[in-house]
Amino acid sequence: MTIAPEGRRLLRVEARNSETPIETKPRWIRNQVKNGPEYQDMKERVAGASLHTVCQEAGCPNIHECWESREATFLIGGANCSRRCDFCMINSARPEPLDRGEPLRVAESVREMQLNYSTITGVTRDDLDDEGAWLYSEVVRKIHELNPHTGVENLVPDFSGKKDLLQEVFESRPEVFAHNVETVPRIFKRIRPAFRYERSLDVIRQARDFGLVTKSNLILGMGETKEEITEALQDLHDAGCDIITITQYLRPGPLFHPIERWVKPEEFLEHADAAKEMGFAAVMSGPLVRSSYRAGRLYAQAMEFRGEEIPAHLAHLKDTSGGSTAQEASTLLERYGASEDTPVVSFN
């Protein structure tokens, strides 16, 4: 393969990736779909108002569970990203002009969907002087303005580590400030060439110093070792990360990084236990966990761990903090049993 679907020539890394066939998923990478009344209501609202969410457009396997809790994720900044990560399906190309009306439209969508909790994520905008800091901040401000009973999580790029840009985002005061490290130092440059591991840790450190609840994510199965995962977890905790999600890499297509291994639920449980032992305020670990999965629940758990009262206008989120969730490793083990009999596939 030498030509991408959109007609351009493949990057060398894409050509190399395409030499490895798409991998077959193990038995524990499956989802149980349950359509509850809140999900059905959300679906009708989204269709009726022609709203757009990452949940639908990315085909997220957790949409039924998250929508049942009235949580949803929105992608801002356009369809093109100014950087390329080897695991990410978002198109890397020159971004579209900034749409200054987007924050209000997103806030109106949150209101129409009657969300309890919203996650905002988006593309990197190195083409803009402020790298998108105003956009990420304004979306939070507009959601809070129109939806005082909705929690907001802001999952942002690194803004090249520029303190003034980060400060602008901090001052919008999302309930959770999230920046995903995604992988371990040894393979970081190969997976995320336009980012820097230490810079990402510093972004989290600055947010924690500002007083925000902080969050990050690790994707497993891209070539890291168990020991490196533990070290990365410790790095994140030392940087002041409150909430950690841990997930399995699922390859979006042949042009993306091959899956190095399928991580078994037992190992996800080990990493969750290690993270809790380190002192993370909230942990979610499992193959189909995503960084925005049950985000309101994790925020409530983190606030309780920190000894802080959830604001009265968000008190309803307390009701989501207990019990197990469908995608946690412990739940998968109860559902499918031990996976030792299923071989770990390596594509090295």
UniProtKB/Swiss-Prot annotation:
Catalytic reaction(s) noted: [[Fe-S] cluster scaffold protein carrying a second [4Fe-4S](2+) cluster] + N(6)-octanoyl-L-lysyl-[protein] + 2 oxidized [2Fe-2S]-[ferredoxin] + 2 S-adenosyl-L-methionine + 4 H(+) = [[Fe-S] cluster scaffold protein] + N(6)-[(R)-dihydrolipoyl]-L-lysyl-[protein] + 4 Fe(3+) + 2 hydrogen sulfide + 2 5'-deoxyadenosine + 2 L-methionine + 2 reduced [2Fe-2S]-[ferredoxin]
Molecular function per GO: 4 iron, 4 sulfur cluster binding; lipoate synthase activity; metal ion binding
Record EC number: 2.8.1.8
Domain Radical SAM core residue range list: 67-281
Binding residues for [4Fe-4S] cluster 1: C55, C60, C66, S292
PROSITE patterns in the cross-refs: RADICAL_SAM (PS51918)
Chief location: cytoplasm
Pathway(s) where this gene product acts: Protein modification; protein lipoylation via endogenous pathway; protein N(6)-(lipoyl)lysine from octanoyl-[acyl-carrier-protein]: step 2/2
Enzyme class: transferase
Cofactor entry: [4Fe-4S] cluster
Cofactor binding note of this UniProt entry: Binds 2 [4Fe-4S] clusters per subunit. One cluster is coordinated with 3 cysteines and an exchangeable S-adenosyl-L-methionine.
UniProt subcellular location: Cytoplasm
UniProt KW keywords: 4Fe-4S, Cytoplasm, Iron, Iron-sulfur, Metal-binding, S-adenosyl-L-methionine, Transferase
Binding site for [4Fe-4S] cluster 2: C81, C85, C88
Family that this chain belongs to: Belongs to the radical SAM superfamily. Lipoyl synthase family.
Cross-referenced HAMAP family: Lipoyl_synth
Listed PANTHER family: LIPOYL SYNTHASE, LIPOYL SYNTHASE, MITOCHONDRIAL
Protein name: Lipoyl synthase
Phylogenetic lineage: Bacteria, Bacillati, Actinomycetota, Actinomycetes, Mycobacteriales
Gene designation: lipA
